[in-house]
Amino acid sequence: MAFYSYNSFLAIFWTRLPGHSVYPSCSHFPSLAFLHLPDSHLRTAYIKNCGSRKYSYPSLTGNNKVHPLRTRLPQKLHTTCWLQHVPGKPQLEQTGKPKAASPQPTKEAKTETTEEKRSLRQKIVNELKYYYKGFSLLWIDTKVAARIVWRLLHGNALTRRERRRLLRTCADVFRLVPFMVFIIVPFMEFLIPVFLKLFPDMLPSTFESESKKEEKQKKTMAAKLEIAKFLQETMTEMARRNRAKLGDASSQLSSYVKQVQTGHKPSTKEIVRFSKLFKDQLALEHLDRPQLVALCKLLELQTFGTNNLLRFQLLMTLKSIKADDEIIAKEGVKALSVSELQSACRARGMRSLGLTEEQLCQQLTGWLDLHLKENVPPSLLLLSRTFYLIDVKPKPIELPPNIETPKPNLGIPTPPPPESKENLTDSAPQLKGTKDEEFIQLPPVPSSLIAPAATISKEAILQAKSQETSQNSKADSKGA
């Protein structure tokens, strides 16, 4: 009877429920859920598993037979009951297979790839801009050179600046002649980058950047400094060999060279005085090969060939320099720009970097005075330029001995706080200031008996302590 009433109660309960209800079958298997279909004649439960087959189990309705499922589920059911945390029981992990994370590229990888692409693209763009600017400047120079040639054909005189520009553009145009071979021969234009890598000086001067120019000038300047030291040593050695002829002049020359090496600026009078001693010995005909090579490096010339070829090369360059000196003397040194001053000093074997405009003008005027007015031989002129090619480092500022160095603590010392007085000062001078009390002072100890702290013996220390205790006891008795 009780069992029948229980079944009838369940039947009424299921008929009143909505179309279908889903609840988890067991807390230990949260991924499983029972599906109950309302039917008065059929009470079966169907297990719903995520992505698995569906099996029917008899419900507790009292029916002994299990009827097969003839109805098709209209849709897949999903429950979130397995996500709820049951208190007192550990929450199990989801039995379903975790989805593989899609391989999405991170932001850093994206930025790296974009930077690489940009850098490669930027390199190509920079190279194209570089060649475009070089060819555009070359085209402008050729147009200006054509106008200069037209003026020259009509009998007009050229200035130094126009003449140098015409020579430079002609040299740049002739540098492009070897590239015609690469254009004429088929498939040979692919070797142009290799050719430029092996011979970078084959490009015209308009393709040379300022940074490359500065690096090249620094390298040549370092080489010239070493050459100047070598030439100074040769001059001192020649003076030592000819001590009998020169006499005191050899010692004066050696001392003068030492002064110049320490930073003394040579004057034109001193150079003329010492150049008269080497008129015959320092001629180009009497110079050896190492000296000729050093002079060629000083003028930035090639050092290949025999001694006669080097002498001829030096003579031709010195003649062109003399003609240039005459033009500069006519136009004036002040008419030159800074770049022109640097190039003129560099062509004459003088320093061109690390100097102001005034210093460059002084160097060039000194060269003109020696070459045109004093008629100094060209070889002696070049050797005299070695005195200007000395790497002088700035000396530290030295104070005279009378002036004392300022002390760091210049402020007025502030009196210490009272707490520090009690701890650090002696109590004897404080007690001397009291009016109603008198104390016996210790007799002064002669200075001859005072020994340093390191040599005082233990006995003397004990005697001094005993005297202090006796005096303190007497003072206490008098006070009482």
UniProtKB/Swiss-Prot annotation:
Instruction: Classify the main location.
Output: mitochondrion
* Record InterPro entries: LETM1-like_RBD, LETM1/MDM38-like, LETM2_N
Query: Membrane spanning segments where?
Result: 176-196
Could you tell me which residues form the transit peptide? 1-25
Topology Mitochondrial matrix: residue spans: 197-480
Q: What PANTHER family does its record include?
A: LETM1 DOMAIN-CONTAINING PROTEIN LETM2, MITOCHONDRIAL, LEUCINE ZIPPER-EF-HAND CONTAINING TRANSMEMBRANE PROTEIN
Q: What is the lineage of its organism?
A: Eukaryota, Metazoa, Chordata, Craniata, Vertebrata
State what protein this is by name. Answer: LETM1 domain-containing protein LETM2, mitochondrial
Q: Which residue numbers delimit the Letm1 RBD domain? A: 219-436
Q: Where is this region: Disordered?
A: 88-118, 398-444
The Basic and acidic residues compositionally biased stretches are 107-118
Any Pfam family:
LETM1_RBD
**Membrane topology (Mitochondrial intermembrane):** 26-175
Q: What is the membrane topology listed in the Swiss-Prot or TrEMBL record?
A: Single-pass membrane protein
Q: Which UniProt keywords apply?
A: Membrane, Mitochondrion, Mitochondrion inner membrane, Transit peptide, Transmembrane, Transmembrane helix
Q: Which gene encodes it?
A: Letm2
One GO MF annotation is: ribosome binding
Transport in keyword set: no
